[in-house]
Amino acid sequence: MKLSKYIDHTLLKPQATEKDILKLIEEAKTYDFASVCVNPSWVKLAYENLKDTNVKVCTVVGFPLGATSIASKVYETKVAIEDGADEIDMVIAVGQLKSGNDEYVKEEIKKIVEASKDKLVKVIIETCLLTEEEKVKACTLSKEAGADYVKTSTGFSTGGAKPEDIKLMREAVGKDMGVKASGGIHTREEMEVMIENGATRIGASCGVELVK
């Protein structure tokens, strides 16, 4: 697979303007990235500009804290898909996981997988807030709930992707599930290290620099 197809070209800053999003979309088309990842209010715009291409539209749910209710996340998912999203990056309820409420976490992922129908679901576990044991548990619950990917980070918390976390997550989910590294990846070397450790998708705001 060519390097560009690993990349979710990402712009999730709250101050991003329509002009910024359109630039992101044009870059994704030029460099043939896997997707653009944008906030839900920009999904329609992204869909309209990418529907005749093979670049997917990715958006976020329960972002960035993961602390909204399951019902809220399900509704967000349904609206995003109606607006044209192909991929959903959802944030788990980190506090519920850390409280040992495994069934809650599994249920919310399962509900979002169901709401997404045949669309891709990536589960953001926010590795920087978890112990090693919790990281493995989050990955296991994601797999059991039927998600397609586990993802390291929102990029809005205390840390981003680390190679050792990618390796741990890959070992936890096995070969038949995607692993997305996101947060703090700024160079091609960093991206290649993530891929070597098991990442099958890279979330980055500097996608153009990574493939030039």
Swiss-Prot record:
GO terms assigned for molecular function: deoxyribose-phosphate aldolase activity
Gene Ontology CC annotations of this record: cytoplasm
Top-level EC class as recorded in UniProt: lyase
Pathway where this protein functions: Carbohydrate degradation; 2-deoxy-D-ribose 1-phosphate degradation; D-glyceraldehyde 3-phosphate and acetaldehyde from 2-deoxy-alpha-D-ribose 1-phosphate: step 2/2
InterPro entries cross-referenced by the UniProt entry: Aldolase_TIM (IPR013785), DeoC (IPR011343), DeoC/FbaB/LacD_aldolase (IPR002915), DeoC_typeI (IPR028581)
Biological processes, Gene Ontology terms: 2-deoxyribose 1-phosphate catabolic process; carbohydrate catabolic process; deoxyribonucleotide catabolic process
Family matches, as Gene3D superfamilies: Aldolase class I
EC number(s) per entry: 4.1.2.4
Compartments in which it is found: Cytoplasm
Keywords: Cytoplasm, Lyase, Schiff base
Top-rank lineage group of the source organism: Bacteria
Active site: 89, 151, 180
Reactions performed catalytically: 2-deoxy-D-ribose 5-phosphate = D-glyceraldehyde 3-phosphate + acetaldehyde
Function noted in UniProt: Catalyzes a reversible aldol reaction between acetaldehyde and D-glyceraldehyde 3-phosphate to generate 2-deoxy-D-ribose 5-phosphate.
Family the UniProt entry places it in: Belongs to the DeoC/FbaB aldolase family. DeoC type 1 subfamily.
Protein name as annotated: Deoxyribose-phosphate aldolase
Primary gene name: deoC
